[in-house]
Amino acid sequence: MSKRIAGPEIERLIQLLARVPGLGPRSARRAALHLIKKKEALLVPLGGAMQEAAEKVRICSCCGNVDTSDPCTICTDERRAPATLIVVEDVSDLWALERAGTMNVRYHVLGGRLSPLDGIGPDDLNIKGLVERVASGAIKEVILAVNATVEGQTTAHYITDQLSNFDVRVTRLAHGVPVGGELDYLDEGTLAAALRARTTL
């Protein structure tokens, strides 16, 4: 059993920080010490921001995004193309696509991907909500922006099957050589996907 080196409040802060993805126990200790050293500049404002977020953050009942309003800012933005819907696994994927700034469309967050080995089936994801949105008739194209994993591809095939009875175009993100990527450093699966998705110049 390890010795306690700080009071229970600091230990609790470290334990909670260690639960954040990307932070282990050692990184959590470093982060906690940094916050404590900068108490007025960081710790107090961070505590306030976290309390406010805990009180105000909502899950959008339309798309599954997180925001402080429901429906979210994206769903209520009338400048976005209402007929195109990008389907993503998680909110982090939605945010990544928004940072890219390529398309001004609406989204649908599944909340994960199908994974029978982990016990995650269609009822555990927001697929029913997607089908209902498409059934309304306003959506003309669904872009499946799921990860290029076995589970992601399984999810894409399942969704495509669920939407097959609707008059909607279902597309998916191209897979292959990343911008600035060198062929010698790519794995065989990525190269094979790039060859299959080749385009005419």
Swiss-Prot record:
Residues 83-178 form the Toprim domain. Transmembrane segments: none annotated. Pfam families: RecR_C, RecR_HhH, RecR_ZnF, Toprim_4. PROSITE patterns: TOPRIM (PS50880). It comes from the Bacteria. SUPFAM superfamilies: Recombination protein RecR. GO terms for biological process: DNA recombination; DNA repair. The keyword Mitochondrion does not apply. A zinc finger (C4-type) spans 60-75. GO terms for molecular function: DNA binding; zinc ion binding. Keywords: DNA damage, DNA recombination, DNA repair, Metal-binding, Zinc, Zinc-finger. May play a role in DNA repair. It seems to be involved in an RecBC-independent recombinational process of DNA repair. It may act with RecF and RecO. Belongs to the RecR family. This is Recombination protein RecR. It comes from Brucella ovis (strain ATCC 25840 / 63/290 / NCTC 10512). The gene is recR.
